[in-house]
């Protein structure tokens, strides 16, 4: 959020044909971050991750579309921006692994869990994009 890249990131997902179904701008509490990143709690970088993520607001988004988790991970690039190719979000906008600006779920199961931490089911908007028939068979 602090980098002023929200619009550019949204644009990339929309251009790919994905559909934004929920979005919130909110603070990331330490409690929520510890729950969200619970699988990393024993890693040495965990305290720094929580501190960094707690330093300002975040924009939480839910995207839908064919293979959105898998394709989204490719669009994000590698966790370490130095290993990310140009054209990926991290390859274009990041320089340090601890400040890689964006999180993407690593599986559908993780996505479902992470979505439930931030959104109620009724907050996910179901609609048909006017571009749907141009993107999908």
From Swiss-Prot:
PROSITE patterns: NDPK, NDPK_LIKE
GO cellular component terms given for this protein: extracellular exosome; nucleus
Keywords per UniProt: ATP-binding, Kinase, Magnesium, Metal-binding, Nucleotide metabolism, Nucleotide-binding, Transferase
Pfam families recorded: NDK
Record has Kinase as a keyword: yes
Any one of the GO BP annotations: regulation of apoptotic process
Gene3D superfamilies the UniProt entry points to: Nucleoside diphosphate kinase-like domain
Molecular-function GO terms, alphabetical: ATP binding; metal ion binding; nucleoside diphosphate kinase activity
Binding residues for ATP: 45, 73, 79, 90, 100
Catalytic reaction annotation: a 2'-deoxyribonucleoside 5'-diphosphate + ATP = a 2'-deoxyribonucleoside 5'-triphosphate + ADP; a ribonucleoside 5'-diphosphate + ATP = a ribonucleoside 5'-triphosphate + ADP
Active site: 103 (pros-phosphohistidine intermediate)
Transmembrane segments: none
EC number: 2.7.4.6
Keyword Magnesium part of the UniProt annotation: yes
Coiled coil residues, start to end: none
UniProt similarity note: Belongs to the NDK family.
Chain's role: Major role in the synthesis of nucleoside triphosphates other than ATP. The ATP gamma phosphate is transferred to the NDP beta phosphate via a ping-pong mechanism, using a phosphorylated active-site intermediate.
Identification of the protein by name: Putative nucleoside diphosphate kinase
Source species of the chain: Homo sapiens
Gene of this entry: NME2P1
């Amino acid at each position: 959020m602090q980098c002023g890249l929200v619009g550019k990131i949204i644009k990339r997902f929309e251009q790919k044909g994905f559909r934004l179904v929920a979005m919130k701008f909110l603070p990331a509490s330490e409690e929520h971050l510890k729950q969200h990143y619970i699988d990393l709690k024993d890693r040495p970088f965990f305290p720094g991750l929580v501190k960094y993520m707690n330093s300002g607001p975040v924009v939480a988004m839910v995207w839908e579309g064919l293979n959105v988790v898998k394709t989204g991970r490719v669009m994000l690039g590698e966790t370490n921006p130095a290993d990310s190719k140009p054209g990926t979000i991290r390859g274009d906008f990041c320089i340090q692994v601890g400040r890689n600006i964006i999180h993407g779920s690593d599986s559908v199961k993780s996505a479902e869990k992470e979505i439930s931490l931030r959104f109620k089911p009724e907050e996910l908007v179901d609609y048909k994009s006017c571009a749907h028939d141009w993107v999908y068979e």
